[in-house]
């Protein structure tokens, strides 16, 4: 009887840690020379949320390594649901889920297309170790984020 209780408690403890939600990773690069730089070493197959302040408006990007090991980057807003304050994506399991309409996308969909509900692609360049985004682009898209209320940390 004691052995059964001990095994049950051990299983419950292991399950709690195995299925616990991962805390999202937020990165706030310091703008320099008209661009922000995201270190590839900071990214993984889980979504990282890149924060930028455009004149007090929070503009957020999603950065991830796709299944084919390419780096993906997009704006963290649902194009169909914008300007809803909840038009942003949160990772649930291996998918990104719009917090307004509930549409789901895989990490491979990040930055892949710009239509409908997909996480909107953003132009960027990359080096062997970095993804580089022009702050001019971030400033131009800031009006779409005026009502956005996604988490930033």
Question: For each predicted feature, which ranges?
Answer:
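Iron-sulfur (Fe-S) cluster-binding segments and ferredoxin-like electron-carrier domains
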Residues: 84-92, 103-112
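Sec/Tat signal peptide C-region and signal peptidase I cleavage site
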Residues: 16-20
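Residue-level signal for mature regions of secreted extracellular proteins and peptides
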Residues: 13, 71, 91-94, 110
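Bacterial N-terminal signal peptides
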Residues: 8-15
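A contiguous, mid-protein "functional segment" used to position or interact
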Residues: 105-107, 115-133
């Amino acid at each position: 009887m004691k052995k059964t209780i001990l095994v049950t408690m051990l299983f419950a403890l292991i399950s709690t840690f195995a299925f616990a939600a991962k805390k999202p990773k937020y990165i706030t690069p310091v703008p320099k020379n008209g661009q922000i730089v995201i270190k590839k070493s900071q990214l993984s197959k889980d979504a990282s949320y890149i924060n930028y302040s455009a004149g007090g408006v929070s503009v957020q990007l999603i950065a991830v390594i796709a299944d084919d090991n390419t780096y993906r980057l997009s704006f963290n807003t649902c194009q169909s649901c914008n300007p809803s304050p909840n038009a942003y994506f949160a990772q649930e399991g291996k998918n990104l889920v719009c917090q307004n309409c509930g549409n789901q996308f895989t990490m491979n969909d990040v930055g892949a297309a710009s239509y409908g509900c997909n996480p909107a692609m953003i132009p960027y360049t990359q080096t062997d170790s970095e993804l580089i985004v022009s702050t001019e682009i971030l400033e131009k898209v800031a009006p779409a984020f005026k009502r956005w209320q996604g988490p930033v940390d």
